[in-house]
């Protein structure tokens, strides 16, 4: 059975992620107590369920500490994937303010709401840190709900085994993705933004590709990043990791980083050098994916 555990910081988008799993045909359970997880899996096995997504949060406090060992036992006979939703504290405070909902771990109403909320968020981060360390982490601070749904849909296309390498473009204007394991700063490369014709386009467009692929610095940067990843990827695999996020950043996350992420993703998808190792590759464009989808 494929077991997908959805967890993370309250307000980071767990409900959106769970709905994406449900839309993909998974049996879904929300807010399941940790103590009931094993019994749930046994019941679903009897019903011949093949795929399940379970959302668990930290509202039951210290019981979450038992979850890593529970998951380790489940991995002996099932495929287990953990999806961890995260966001920076300021974004979470804003979201709770907009929805006027209380944080599940907010218990002291005598203090100002902002102080109580910050304490609750910090407590939740500490409780969930052991899970985040072994999960596929998604920072939702700068992405809307539709982008998160799209990213989850892409994730579901991959097998929940082996190492998943995520190539993600971003703009430094909005900060470095918190889930990034490797960060490459490509702001030193010539910027298509200063070409009036190329400015409204993106790294996905042919004119921008043709512009960048002719620049020696871009070619050398791509070669150096490729060589670095190619050399060290086997070591990350040997380290037992399930996920590796390679973030490429330029100023706005529109041209240079998008182009290089596409090039890297295309290159590594074609590689056979890693033998029988099972590798999955995903590519994301944080700033482009955040653009609202036009309604038809």
From Swiss-Prot:
Keywords: ATP-binding, GTP-binding, Nucleotide-binding. Belongs to the RapZ-like family. Displays ATPase and GTPase activities. The keyword GTP-binding applies. ATP binds at residues 8-15. HAMAP family: RapZ_like. This is Nucleotide-binding protein Pnec_1620. SUPFAM superfamilies: P-loop containing nucleoside triphosphate hydrolases. It comes from Polynucleobacter necessarius subsp. necessarius (strain STIR1). GTP binds at residues 57-60. GO terms for molecular function: ATP binding; GTP binding.
